[in-house]
């Protein structure tokens, strides 16, 4: 992942990101921590960038260190609309974190529940009738 690509994702610069995608940048490129632009944008709360990356083929199921996915990062950052967007885009809602305290063995729905986000937890729980 180039510094420009990382900055566009972190800063919500959808125009720069779109330009780089058109130039052939891999939407699933990873930074030195194994995070993709989708993870960075989801964590930072940049919904327009998340949507552009999904439309460009970014994989919502990629995980970084400790098994954290873009959906999990959106949840722990309190970005409910982005977590919902990722779920609607087909993110694996059964993926579980591994190793990190507070994340090990937990799904995005578990993380939402831990943070008191009951409505979001229901949306992210495949066994819920609200999903």
Question: What does each of the following model-derived ranges do?
Answer:
Residues 93-129:
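Leucine-rich solenoid repeat scaffolds
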